[in-house]
C-alpha cells in the first residue's frame, strides 16, 4: 500500500474558526523527492484533495484530523470519502503513533523520567518530535509571530505559483518533516519493542471528537447571569460565618481615603495559618497524622480537607467555598472572551470543547484552548451545565451507557476465566448495582436479612428492585440507600482501592455516600461480631498505620468504625463476585512489567504492571491499581465509547449512510455519555433510537458476550437532572425541569 504524507495551511484559529478556511494543501509520496503544493486559487486543488482522501493508500499527517476537517469544510462532497477512509483504517496521525509508542514502552504520556530523577514534559507538536527524532529545531518557524505559519490567510485566492519563497519553503518543509518523523517512529518502535497498534482507530476517534469541538455549544445569557449571582451569593461572607469566626476567612477591605486619594481595596482572602490550625485540630479528632508539604508546612489540599471536614464545621464551609470558588475561578472565565471589538470581555455565544483523544488510561480528556472560547467539557460543574442550551429549533439528544464499567468488567472476566457473575446478572435481566445492594442490605440491615432468609441473592435482588416502584416512600428510600451504597462498592473495589481511599471516593461525586455516618449508625453488635471475625487483623493494620498505636490500644473510634465498614463491604462484594479474587491474582502473576522499574522514597523497587486493551494497545509502567482499573474497566469502556463516537458522527455527517441522524451534530463526549444536537421535528424519537443502537453496536466490538444498553433522552438545555420522558404512544419527548 502506498503512503501519502499530507498537510494544510489555513487562516488563523479564533472564535468561530476552530477549523479555519483552507488556503493550501501540500503532499508527498513515501520515498519520493517531489513535494506537491496547491493554493485555493489553483483549480486543481479540489481534485488533489480528492486524490488524497481516496481509498487504497495510507494517509499520514501531523494532527491529520485538523487537515481532514478543513478539507471537508472546503469541499463538502469529499466528506463521505474521508469517513470511509478513516473507518477503513487508512489514516494515521503522528500524535497517536507517538503516544502509543510511549504508552507501550514507558507508559508515560505527559512527563518522562530522566536518569537524574527529574522529569521532562513530553511534547507532541511537530516541533517537539522533529527535535526529538531529527535534532531539528523548528521552534522559530512554529512560534514566532512573523512566521509564515501565521500569514497564509494573506495568500487567500492565489495560486501556489505566486506564493513568496518563505511560505513555499515552510509548507513543503512541514510535509517532508512529517515523513521523516514517521520513519523515525517506525525505527524507534522496532528498537524499543514498542507497539503502535490502534493508531488508526484513535485517529478516527480523534477526527470525530474534533468535529464535535468545531460545533461547540450555544450559551444562555440569562442562565449565565443566574449562575454568576448564585456564585456571588454563595461566596458572600454572610454564608461563611464559621469560616469568619475561625479566622480562616479574612473579610474584604474597602478602599479608604489616604493622602488625597483612595487605597486599593482587598477582596476576602484565606488566612493560611488559621486554616492550618483547624486542619491540625481536625486531624487529631479524626486520629490521623497531619500531612505535611515538601516545605514542611501543614498540607490543606482537597484530599486532606475531604478526610477531616466532618470534624470541623469551618472546614466544611471551606470545602463548600472552594467548590463554588472553582466555578468563579474556571467556569465563568472560560465562558468569557474578548472579541477585540472594543466591548471588552463578555459571555461568548458559543463555547467549544477540545479533546485529548488518548491519555495514559487510554481514555480521553478535555481542556480549554487559548485560541477560542472553550472549556473542559468532561468536568463541567453541574451548576454550570444549564448555561449550555440547544440552538433555536434544535434540542439536545443525550445518551449514556448503562453500567458501562460493570459490563466491561464482566466481559474481561468472562474472556480471561470463562465465567463472570457480572455477566450472569446482566444476562438474567438484572441490575448489578441492585444485585450487590441486596447482598449489602442482607448483611447490614437486620429486617431485610430476616425477610430474605432462605432466598437466593437473585430473589433478594428482585425484592429490593420491587421497592423502587413501591407506593411507600420508605421502600423507595430503602432501595435508593442500598443501591446507592452498592455503586461505590461495586465500582471502587474492582480498581483495587484500599479502604481509606475507597471511603474518600465514596464521599465524592457522583456517589455522595456518607460511609462514616452509616458506620456510626450501626449497632454495637455489628462491631462485636467484626472483632471476632477474619477482617479484624486488617483493621488492626490500619489502626497502627494511622495512629501509631499498638493493638492493645485499639478503640472503636468513628474512624475505625468507618474503616471496618469499608472492609466489611469489600468482603460482601468478594462473596458476590468471587471471580474478582482470581482477577486480582491474574494481574499480580500475568501482568508484571519486566521492562520498567520504579522505586519508592527509600529507593526500594516497586513492581510495575502492564496490560493489553481489547483492541490491542499495550500499556506499560502501571501500578497495580492502574491495571485493575484499566484492564477491566477504563480501557474497554474507552475503546467502545470512542467507537460509538465515530459511528454516530459519521451517520450525522456522511450523507451516503442514509441515516435518520444525518444533519444532526454531536457536541459533547463525556466518557460514557454522548450529547448530540438534533433538529426539533417529528423524527426525534427515531433519531434517539438510532443513536442508542449505534452505541450498543460500537460497544459490542469490545464486549461481544455481555450486552449493554444505551439510554437516550431529550432536553433543551444540559442538565444533570434530565430523565427519559415518553408520551402516551411511548415515544421519547423533551424533558423539562
Predicted feature locations:
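Mixed-charge, glycine-rich, non-catalytic linkers/tails in nucleic-acid processing enzymes
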Residues: 81-94, 116, 139-257, 413-427, ...
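Active-site-proximal helix-loop-helix substrate-binding element of RNase H-like nuclease domains
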Residues: 20-23, 31-189, 430-468
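Acidic, glycine-rich two-metal-ion catalytic cores of nucleic acid-processing enzymes
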Residues: 2-31, 43, 252-476, 582-673, ...
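Catalytic palm subdomain of template-directed nucleic-acid polymerases
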Residues: 100-108, 211-236, 409, 489-494, ...
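Core structural elements
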Residues: 170-187, 191-219, 232-233, 271-285, ...
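Catalytic phosphate/metal-binding cores of nucleic-acid and nucleotide-processing enzymes, i.e., regions
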Residues: 6, 10, 19, 185-189, ...
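Short glycine-rich phosphate-binding loop at a beta-alpha junction
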Residues: 57-65, 269, 400, 501-504, ...
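Polymerase palm active-site segment centered on the conserved acidic dipeptide of motif C
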Residues: 179, 230-259, 269, 567-581, ...
Amino acid at each position: 500500500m502506498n503512503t501519502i504524507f499530507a498537510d494544510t495551511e489555513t487562516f488563523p484559529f479564533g472564535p468561530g474558526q476552530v477549523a479555519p478556511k483552507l488556503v493550501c494543501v501540500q503532499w508527498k509520496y513515501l520515498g519520493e523527492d517531489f513535494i506537491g503544493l496547491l493554493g485555493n486559487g489553483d483549480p486543481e486543488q479540489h481534485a488533489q484533495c480528492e486524490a488524497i482522501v481516496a481509498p487504497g493508500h495510507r494517509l499520514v499527517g501531523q494532527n491529520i484530523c485538523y487537515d481532514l476537517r478543513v478539507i471537508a469544510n472546503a469541499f463538502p462532497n469529499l466528506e463521505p470519502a474521508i469517513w470511509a477512509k478513516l473507518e477503513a483504517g487508512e489514516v494515521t496521525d503522528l500524535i497517536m503513533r507517538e503516544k502509543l509508542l510511549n504508552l507501550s514502552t514507558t507508559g508515560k504520556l505527559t512527563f518522562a523520567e530522566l536518569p537524574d530523577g527529574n522529569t521532562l514534559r513530553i511534547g507532541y507538536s511537530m516541533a517537539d518530535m522533529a527535535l526529538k527524532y531529527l535534532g531539528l529545531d523548528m521552534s522559530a518557524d512554529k512560534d514566532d509571530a512573523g512566521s509564515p505559519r501565521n500569514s497564509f490567510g494573506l495568500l487567500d485566492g492565489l495560486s501556489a505559483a505566486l506564493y513568496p519563497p518563505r511560505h513555499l519553503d515552510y509548507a513543503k518543509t512541514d510535509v517532508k518533516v512529517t515523513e521523516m518523523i514517521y520513519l523515525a517512529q517506525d525505527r524507534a518502535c522496532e528498537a524499543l519493542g514498542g507497539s503502535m497498534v490502534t493508531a488508526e482507530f484513535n485517529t478516527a476517534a480523534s477526527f470525530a471528537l474534533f468535529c464535535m469541538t468545531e460545533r461547540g455549544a450555544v450559551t444562555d445569557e440569562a442562565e449565565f447571569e443566574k449562575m454568576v449571582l448564585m456564585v456571588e451569593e454563595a461566596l458572600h461572607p454572610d454564608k461563611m460565618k464559621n469560616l469568619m469566626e475561625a479566622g480562616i476567612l479574612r473579610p474584604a477591605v474597602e478602599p479608604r481615603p489616604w493622602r488625597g486619594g483612595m487605597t486599593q481595596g482587598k477582596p476576602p482572602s484565606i488566612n493560611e495559618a488559621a486554616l492550618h490550625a483547624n486542619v491540625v485540630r481536625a486531624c487529631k479528632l479524626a486520629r490521623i497524622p497531619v500531612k505535611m508539604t515538601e516545605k514542611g508546612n501543614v498540607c490543606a489540599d482537597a484530599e486532606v480537607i475531604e478526610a477531616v471536614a466532618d470534624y470541623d464545621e469551618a472546614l466544611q464551609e471551606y470545602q463548600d467555598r472552594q467548590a463554588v470558588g472553582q466555578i468563579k475561578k474556571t467556569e465563568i472565565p472560560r465562558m468569557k472572551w474578548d472579541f477585540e471589538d472594543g466591548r471588552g470581555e463578555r459571555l461568548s455565544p458559543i463555547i467549544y470543547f477540545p479533546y485529548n483523544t488518548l491519555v495514559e488510561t487510554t481514555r480521553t480528556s478535555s481542556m480549554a484552548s487559548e485560541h477560542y472560547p472553550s472549556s473542559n467539557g468532561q468536568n463541567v460543574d453541574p451548576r454550570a451545565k444549564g448555561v449550555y442550551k440547544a440552538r433555536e429549533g434544535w434540542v439536545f439528544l443525550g445518551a449514556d451507557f448503562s453500567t458501562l464499567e460493570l459490563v466491561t468488567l464482566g466481559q474481561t472476566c468472562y474472556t480471561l476465566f470463562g465465567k463472570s457473575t457480572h455477566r450472569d446478572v446482566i444476562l438474567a435481566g438484572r441490575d448489578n448495582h441492585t444485585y450487590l445492594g441486596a447482598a449489602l442490605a442482607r448483611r447490614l440491615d437486620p429486617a431485610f436479612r430476616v425477610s430474605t432468609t432462605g432466598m437466593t441473592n437473585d430473589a433478594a435482588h428482585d425484592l429490593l428492585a420491587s421497592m423502587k416502584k413501591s407506593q411507600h416512600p420508605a421502600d423507595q428510600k430503602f432501595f435508593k440507600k442500598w443501591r446507592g451504597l452498592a455503586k461505590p462498592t461495586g465500582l471502587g473495589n474492582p480498581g483495587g482501592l484500599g479502604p481509606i481511599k475507597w471511603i474518600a471516593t465514596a464521599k465524592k461525586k457522583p456517589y455522595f455516600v456518607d460511609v462514616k455516618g452509616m458506620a456510626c449508625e450501626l449497632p454495637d453488635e455489628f462491631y462485636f461480631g467484626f472483632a471476632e471475625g477474619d477482617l479484624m487483623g486488617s483493621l488492626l493494620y490500619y489502626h497502627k498505620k494511622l495512629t501509631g498505636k499498638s493493638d492493645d490500644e485499639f478503640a472503636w473510634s468513628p474512624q475505625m468504625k468507618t474503616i471496618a465498614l469499608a472492609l466489611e463491604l469489600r468482603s460482601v462484594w468478594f462473596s458476590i463476585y468471587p471471580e474478582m479474587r482470581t482477577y486480582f491474582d491474574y494481574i499480580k502473576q500475568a501482568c508484571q512489567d519486566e521492562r520498567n522499574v520504579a522505586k519508592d522514597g527509600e529507593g526500594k523497587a516497586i513492581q510495575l504492571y502492564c496490560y493489553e486493551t481489547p483492541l490491542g494497545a499495550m500499556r506499560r509502567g502501571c501500578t497495580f491499581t492502574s491495571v485493575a482499573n484499566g484492564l477491566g474497566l477504563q480501557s474497554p469502556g474507552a475503546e467502545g465509547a470512542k467507537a460509538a463516537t465515530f459511528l454516530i458522527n459519521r451517520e450525522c455527517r456522511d450523507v451516503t449512510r442514509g441515516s435518520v441522524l444525518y444533519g444532526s451534530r454531536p457536541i459533547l463526549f463525556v466518557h460514557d455519555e454522548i450529547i448530540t444536537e438534533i433538529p426539533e421535528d417529528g423524527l426525534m424519537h427515531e433519531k434517539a433510537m438510532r443513536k442508542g443502537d449505534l452505541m450498543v453496536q460500537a460497544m459490542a466490538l469490545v464486549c461481544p458476550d455481555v450486552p449493554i444498553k444505551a439510554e437516550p433522552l431529550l432536553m433543551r438545555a444540559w442538565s444533570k437532572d434530565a430523565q427519559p420522558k415518553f408520551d402516551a404512544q411511548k415515544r421519547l419527548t423533551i424533558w423539562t425541569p
